[in-house]
A protein has these predicted regions:
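Catalytic loop of short-chain dehydrogenase/reductase
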Residues: 106-107, 114-127, 146-174
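A short, exposed helix-loop element centered on a Lys and neighboring polar residues
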Residues: 138-139
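Conserved hydrophobic beta-strands of the Rossmann-like cofactor-binding core
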Residues: 24-27, 100-101
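Rossmann-fold cofactor-recognition segment
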Residues: 66-83
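Conserved Rossmann-fold cofactor-binding substructure of NAD(P)-dependent oxidoreductases
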Residues: 79-95
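Conserved glycine-rich cofactor-binding loop
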Residues: 31
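Conserved glycine-rich Rossmann-like NAD(P)H-binding loop of the short-chain dehydrogenase/reductase
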Residues: 45-61
Length: 174
């Protein structure tokens, strides 16, 4: 449904048209999964795509996409690290962002989430990523979003965020 909301109004230009300034979009977690698909779709439509990855050097598929879409650039972002979020904001100072796609989420190992074998440090990381990181990224990039024309924020997640849809999880700790 969210895909339909963000893409309901297609860009006002065709991919073959010359546009003075295509819209800018930032996609977090663009190195794989849904984030990669979103970054790819926006790049194919001619948008200026800022695609973030926790480990850009390991994001071979995303780097290949950037090689075929010159309007796609890759930025380092570790959404679990406040300093990394702040550094991204500093690097993007003055850069308008029309759409921010917050694509974050991690599941972790089942045995780290059970009473009796809880790894508190890892669980803290899961909670920080799943519950707080999108908010922190949005907060830091708010000036960029306000400077954009569309001013849209999309929050997406995969099945890892739904325990009902992922029955193998035995994580009463959530």
């Amino acid at each position: 449904l969210l895909w339909a909301i963000v893409f309901a109004s297609p860009p006002t230009f065709a991919a073959t048209t010359t546009v003075a300034e295509p819209p800018p979009v930032l996609v977090t977690g663009a190195n794989r999964g849904l984030g990669y698909v979103w970054a790819k779709k926006y790049a194919e439509r001619g948008w200026n795509v800022i695609a973030t990855a926790r480990r850009p050097a390991d994001a071979a598929q995303l780097r290949a996409l950037a090689g075929t879409h010159p309007r796609l650039r890759i930025e380092l972002l570790d959404a679990t690290d406040a300093a990394s979020i702040d550094q991204l904001g500093t690097r993007l100072a003055g850069q308008p962002i029309d759409i921010l796609v917050n694509n974050v989420g991690m599941l972790g190992e089942e045995d780290e989430q059970r009473l009796g074998s809880l790894d508190a440090s890892r669980f803290d990381t899961y909670m920080r990523v799943n519950a707080l990181s999108a908010l922190l990224v949005t907060e830091r990039l708010l000036p960029n979003i306000r400077a954009g024309k569309q001013k849209k924020i999309a929050g997406i997640s995969a099945v890892v965020a739904s325990f009902a849809a992922y029955p193998r999880i035995h994580s009463g700790l959530y």
